[in-house]
């Protein structure tokens, strides 16, 4: 607004929403079966983004990198070299 050559400015900022104040729900990633646990074929063992843990024996990897059991057996988390980890499922009679 321009009155007599003076320009008037708002003395309060517009009442818009704040820039923060958003948060997305957690994705429920991580281990779904523990080391030494007995599971059935098809059971999800580990949900992940990217290949944080690699599939080992009798473990499949889904399109979203989820690891799941291919056979009934016992879960075993193992080291794969110095920096990598893998998870395997050993049939119950083989695990003993």
From Swiss-Prot:
Location of region: Disordered: 12-33
GO biological process, one term: translation
Keyword Translocase: no
Biased composition (Low complexity): 19-28
One Pfam family from the record: Ribosomal_L27
Keyword annotations of the record: Ribonucleoprotein, Ribosomal protein
Organism domain of life: Bacteria
GO cellular component, one term: cytosolic large ribosomal subunit
UniProt keyword Lipid biosynthesis present: no
Gene Ontology MF, one: structural constituent of ribosome
InterPro entries associated with the record: Ribosomal_bL27, Ribosomal_bL27_CS
Family that this chain belongs to: Belongs to the bacterial ribosomal protein bL27 family.
Protein name per the record: Large ribosomal subunit protein bL27
Gene source species: Lactobacillus helveticus (strain DPC 4571)
Annotated gene: rpmA
